[in-house]
Amino acid sequence: MVYARRRLSPIKPGEPIKYTDVELLKKFVTERGKILPRRITGLTAKQQRQVSKAIKQARILGLLYFVNKEG
């Protein structure tokens, strides 16, 4: 019998997701600047909404690029 491997969320439950934490937010963005989907990141639905909201806010404030300038 094969059991599905349970993925652990990269963010602990209840941990605040802040738009100023650029290093954390970069983990959820591709090289081209697109937000990674929930099935790849392993986040819960609530965490995914918070992360995408924080990424969008950081982009508007200039903390994250809309498109990666490297390459």
Swiss-Prot record:
Keywords per UniProt: Ribonucleoprotein, Ribosomal protein, RNA-binding, rRNA-binding
Gene3D superfamilies: Ribosomal protein S18
Gene Ontology molecular functions: small ribosomal subunit rRNA binding; structural constituent of ribosome
GO biological process: one example: translation
Cysteines engaged in disulfide bonds, as pairs: none
One Pfam short name: Ribosomal_S18
Range of residues in the leader sequence: none
GO cellular component term, pick one: cytosolic small ribosomal subunit
UniProt family annotation: Belongs to the bacterial ribosomal protein bS18 family.
Function in brief: Binds as a heterodimer with protein bS6 to the central domain of the 16S rRNA, where it helps stabilize the platform of the 30S subunit.
NCBIfam families: S18
Assembly, per entry: Part of the 30S ribosomal subunit. Forms a tight heterodimer with protein bS6.
Protein known as: Small ribosomal subunit protein bS18
Record lineage: Bacteria, Bacillati, Cyanobacteriota, Cyanophyceae, Synechococcales
